[in-house]
Every structure is written in structure tokens, then in C-alpha cells.
């Protein structure tokens, strides 16, 4: 009967698990499974959690992650639906976020960070003007040029940014953290790659662009066009990339900014997942097929010090898989919740800032316990400055120590999964996330909840509680409200700033570009206007537009066509 069949399957699975010997001589299985022959326990595990890489993906999105590659065979993953490209890498989570000064400054930082890596996974931070679609010569922005991220005005900046990297190589990928002007920035990347390698490079490009407009309205405030127009431009980009860039993730549905704005871990998960379901509905309404675009959706979560983070990503993987299978009838590849994690920026404290090294290490451990697909670990000095090279290196080495020096992840998968405490946290978090879903549904869905300012108001209330708890001492912050060194506040710290000379160099380059392309730019902008006004694909046209136009020129023309974002009051 069923019990006998289940036991036979379980024994077959167990017998196929490879054994490995650690340097100290300890024999371990490559995959930790519950030690039981009880059919009820086996059924609860196989159907409630699933084996790594199997529905509902609680333990991980893929069957092998972090394991020492010299001792196991690479996992070949199936190609994308309808003729996409196969992906054959075991997951390596290190993806470090960088962006400072001008394009060549960030390029040097990228080369420094990846000098000993086989798999080069860059993650790009942009400066304030770029994030808002402004040029470096726009009124009032000079002081922000190159601060907190890299200044990108033109396709020439984009060429400098990734110079010397093999853009089409299967071991290279890039992530871009940008939202409002994301289509123009990705168009610059595609056009710059074509300049350097020719048109054949386009289907080989691998990477991710954030482009999550819904969370901008809810938390980060970097939406620059009206919501309806922004969603249209996003869908144009998803439609184009799904057809022409099969290795590209055209959206990273992001809870990180929601959490950094003050949301609780449960709110982060609930708002991120509900935003994701809304995007699926929007893309399907355009006529896109879920099994085509679904595998190209990715996610980005915060990982802080709260106990919820012991199981938050596990819950998200399960709920996403169930909804994609049962509500949207998506296949297994679209059911996978592919996750990039960043350690918490909000948890970093300027007082006795070297304590941040410990905070980040603990958060990194939690992210790896949750089998994140990639991870950025913050630098200890980010609480008060653009990260310095010293602390960037320490952040990178923290990941190497976690994955290569310790034995927690490289010998055995699922080392921590299934503990009684984890199960309690997992169940409680899941129930709380579902309660948030019910409230959003009661309001009429995500877009209606945005009109009611529901997500924003809940985030603000949570942020207020968080700060109040710190002020009252109910939330201990070591070195700030507990065990404080009073002399620490008098010690000087090094603050990284972009020199004024470099800011002026960026402006001069931009103005030279505009002079060279003056006539061609006006014609290119008129052609873009024609496409937008007549319902064509804006992104396809942008790849041509960026050859002659700056980011600010494109943004200004689109503002003329669709207007500016105005929040509901």
C-alpha cells in the first residue's frame, strides 16, 4: 500500500546519499534527512518540506548548494521553458554590492573584489541622481554625484563601468539595484555590450535588474513616473528580456527596502510576496505566459537579527511555490523562489561600529541557514560612510570563512533544517504572513491597498515601535543603549567622499557627450515619443535611444509624455 511505497522511496533516497569525510575524519552524509522509518514522519517531511530542490522548496530552491565542488558533481538544471538556456552551476552565494564615485572607480573596486573568484557576480549601487533618472549636470545635484553609488549618465559611463569583464561568459553575471529608470539603465547595458562584442552577445548576457516599482511606492520613494506608466514600462522590459535575454532576470521583487524602511520581518515577507503575485497578474494581463516569465522572477530579502529570520526565507519559498502551482498553474521552474539576501543595514550602528562585524556575521549565518541563492554582506563602516576598501574586504572574507573555512555548509546540506525551534518559528511566521495576506485581500488587493496607504502606514508604525524600543531599552543594541563605551563617541572615523574634482569631471564628460550627439539626440527622443504614444515596446526603442541620449534627457522626455509620480495623500 501507500505506506510500503513511501518507505521504499525513503530507503532509496537514503541509500543514494553520498558520504563525505571531513578533514578531522568525521563521516557525514551530503544531505541531512530525518532519522526515521515512521511513515507519518516521512510523509510530513517529503510533502510538507520536500527534499532540497523539490516542491514546496522549503529547504532550498535547488538540490545542491554551497557544497565543496571538488567532491561532488555539478547539478545540471533543465533549460528554460520553450527553448531557453540551461544553467549548470552549483549555487555560490557571494555577490558583493559596490558603487562609488565615477564608473572607473567602481570598475576598480569590482576587479579588486573579484580578483580571486572563478564565478564573477557583480552587484551595482548607483548614486542618488542616477536613481532618480537625473543627469549629473542637473540643477542642485552636484553634491550627490558619485556619493553612495556610481554616477551613470550615458552609454559611455556604462562601458567604463564593466570594462575588462567577460560580459557573455557563463561564469559572469551582474546585478543592478535601480528601479524608476531601470529600463533606460538596462538598455544602456545591452547597448554597451553590443558595442563591445556585437549583437550576438545579447542572448548570452546574465544578470538581474531590480525594477520593483510597487515597493518604491510602499517604502523607498524612488518611483519617477505615475504608477500605471511605470508598470507599463516594466512590462515592456519583461516582455523584451523574456524573448531576447533568456539568462536575464528583469525584476528582483524586493523586501529589503521594505524592511529597511521599518517593516517587521513578517511584513517584509507578506508585502514582498503579495507584490510578486500582483506582478504575475499584470504580466499575464499583457498576454505573457507564466511558464515563460515565471522562471525569470527573482527576489531580494533583508536578513536581520530577529528570530523570524531563522525561517523567513523557508516560509517565502513555500508560499510562493504553493501559489504559483495552485493559483497560477505554473510549472516547477516558475515555482522556485530564487533569492538574493543582504544583511541588514538598519542593524548597523555608528557607535562602536566594529561591533557591526559580529552583527553581519550572525546575519550571514542566518541567510546561509535559509539557503539563500546569493548574498551580500554589509561592511561594518556603512553606518556612517560609503564602505572603505578595508571593511569591504572583511565583509567579503566573512562569506568565505562561513562557506569555506567552517564545516557548517560545505560538507552537508540541510544541517539545521527541521529542528523543533525552527519548526515553531516557521509555523508562526507562516500564520502571520497569511494573516497579512487576508488583510490586503480585504482591502481589494495590493494596488487598492496602496491607494489606502496600507503598506506605508504599517511600515511607519513598525518603524516607530522599533525606535521607541531602542530609546526605552526594550531592544538592546550593544554599544548604543547597552554596555556603551562613553569614550567611543570622541574617536575620529574615516568618511569616504567623492572628490569635487571627480564630480566636475563627470559633468564635463556628460556635456561633451551631449554636444556630440545634439542633433541625433533630438531625433532619437522623437522616435521614442512615437513608440510610447502609439503603444509600442518602450524598452526595445530605448536600446536605440541610449546611443545618443543621456539618462536625464530620456527621463525628461518621458515626463513630458506620461507625467510625474504623485503620491496619494
Predicted regions and their residues:
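Generic, well-ordered alpha-helical scaffold segments in large soluble proteins
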Residues: 109-116, 155-165, 188-196, 236-244, ...
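Short hydrophobic/aromatic segments of transmembrane alpha-helices and their interfaces
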Residues: 140-142, 261, 356-357, 404, ...
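Flexible, glycine-rich loop/tail regions that form catalytic "lids" or insertion modules at the edges
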Residues: 4-41, 48-61, 67-68, 74, ...
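Active-site capping/gating regions of soluble enzymes
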Residues: 270-275, 279, 298-479
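Conserved active-site and cofactor/substrate-binding residues in soluble primary-metabolism enzymes
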Residues: 52, 101-105, 117, 153-156, ...
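Catalytic alpha/beta active-site cores
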Residues: 1-82, 89-309, 327, 331-340, ...
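Short secondary-structure transition/capping segments
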Residues: 134-137, 386-389, 461-462, 565-567
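A short glycine/serine-rich beta->alpha loop
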Residues: 172-178, 262-265, 348-352, 383-386, ...
Amino acid at each position: 500500500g501507500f505506506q510500503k511505497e513511501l518507505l521504499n522511496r525513503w530507503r532509496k533516497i537514503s541509500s543514494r546519499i553520498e558520504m563525505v569525510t571531513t578533514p578531522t575524519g568525521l563521516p557525514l552524509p551530503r544531505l541531512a534527512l530525518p532519522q526515521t522509518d515512521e511513515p507519518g514522519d516521512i510523509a510530513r517531511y517529503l510533502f510538507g518540506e520536500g527534499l532540497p530542490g523539490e516542491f514546496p522548496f522549503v529547504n532550498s530552491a535547488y538540490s545542491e548548494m554551497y557544497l565543496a565542488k571538488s567532491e561532488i558533481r555539478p547539478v545540471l538544471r533543465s533549460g528554460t521553458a520553450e527553448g531557453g538556456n540551461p544553467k549548470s552551476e552549483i549555487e555560490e552565494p557571494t555577490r558583493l554590492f559596490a558603487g562609488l564615485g565615477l564608473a572607473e572607480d567602481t570598475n576598480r573596486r569590482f576587479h579588486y573584489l573579484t580578483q580571486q573568484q572563478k564565478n564573477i557576480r557583480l552587484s551595482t549601487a548607483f548614486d542618488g541622481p542616477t536613481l532618480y533618472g537625473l543627469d549629473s549636470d542637473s540643477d542642485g545635484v552636484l553634491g550627490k554625484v558619485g556619493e553612495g553609488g556610481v554616477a551613470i549618465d550615458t552609454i559611455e559611463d556604462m562601458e567604463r563601468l564593466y570594462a575588462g569583464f567577460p560580459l557573455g561568459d557563463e561564469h559572469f553575471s551582474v546585478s543592478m539595484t535601480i528601479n524608476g529608470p531601470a529600463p533606460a539603465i538596462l538598455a544602456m547595458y545591452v547597448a554597451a555590450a553590443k558595442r563591445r562584442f556585437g549583437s550576438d552577445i545579447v542572448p548570452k548576457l546574465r544578470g538581474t535588474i531590480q525594477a520593483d516599482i510597487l515597493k518604491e511606492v510602499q517604502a523607498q520613494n524612488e518611483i519617477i513616473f505615475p504608477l500605471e506608466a511605470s508598470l507599463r514600462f516594466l512590462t515592456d522590459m519583461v516582455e523584451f528580456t523574456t524573448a531576447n535575454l533568456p539568462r536575464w532576470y528583469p525584476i528582483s521583487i524586493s523586501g529589503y527596502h521594505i524592511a529597511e524602511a521599518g517593516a517587521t520581518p513578517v511584513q517584509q515577507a507578506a508585502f514582498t510576496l503579495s507584490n510578486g503575485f500582483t506582478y504575475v497578474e499584470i504580466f499575464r494581463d499583457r498576454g505573457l505566459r507564466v511558464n515563460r516569465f515565471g522562471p525569470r522572477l527573482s527576489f531580494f530579502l533583508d536578513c536581520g537579527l530577529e528570530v523570524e529570520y531563522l525561517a523567513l526565507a523557508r516560509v517565502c519559498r513555500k508560499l510562493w511555490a504553493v501559489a504559483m502551482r495552485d493559483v497560477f498553474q505554473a510549472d516547477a521552474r516558475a515555482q522556485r523562489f530564487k533569492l538574493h539576501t543582504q544583511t541588514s543595514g538598519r542593524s548597523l550602528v555608528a557607535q562602536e561600529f566594529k561591533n557591526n562585524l559580529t552583527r553581519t556575521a550572525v546575519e550571514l549565518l542566518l541567510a546561509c541557514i535559509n539557503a539563500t541563492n546569493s548574498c551580500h554582506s554589509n561592511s561594518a563602516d556603512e553606518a556612517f560612510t560609503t564602505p572603505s576598501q578595508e571593511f569591504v574586504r572583511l565583509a567579503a572574507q566573512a562569506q568565505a570563512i562561513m562557506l569555506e573555512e567552517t564545516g557548517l555548509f560545505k560538507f552537508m546540506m540541510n544541517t539545521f533544517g527541521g529542528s523543533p525551534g525552527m519548526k515553531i518559528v516557521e509555523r508562526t511566521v507562516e500564520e502571520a504572513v497569511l494573516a497579512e495576506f487576508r488583510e490586503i485581500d480585504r482591502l481589494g488587493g495590493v494596488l487598492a491597498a496602496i491607494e489606502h496607504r496600507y503598506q506605508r502606514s504599517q511600515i511607519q508604525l513598525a518603524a516607530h515601535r522599533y525606535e521607541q524600543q531602542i530609546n526605552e531599552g526594550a531592544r538592546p543594541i550593544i554599544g548604543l543603549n547597552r554596555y556603551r563605551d562613553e569614550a567611543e563617541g570622541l574617536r575620529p572615523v574615516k568618511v569616504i567622499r567623492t572628490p569635487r574634482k571627480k564630480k566636475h569631471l563627470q559633468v564635463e564628460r556628460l556635456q561633451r557627450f551631449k554636444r556630440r550627439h545634439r542633433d541625433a539626440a533630438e531625433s532619437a527622443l522623437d522616435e521614442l515619443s512615437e513608440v510610447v504614444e502609439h503603444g509600442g515596446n518602450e524598452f526595445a526603442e530605448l536600446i536605440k535611444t541610449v546611443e545618443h541620449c543621456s539618462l536625464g534627457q530620456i527621463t525628461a522626455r518621458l515626463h513630458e509624455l506620461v507625467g510625474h509620480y504623485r503620491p496619494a495623500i
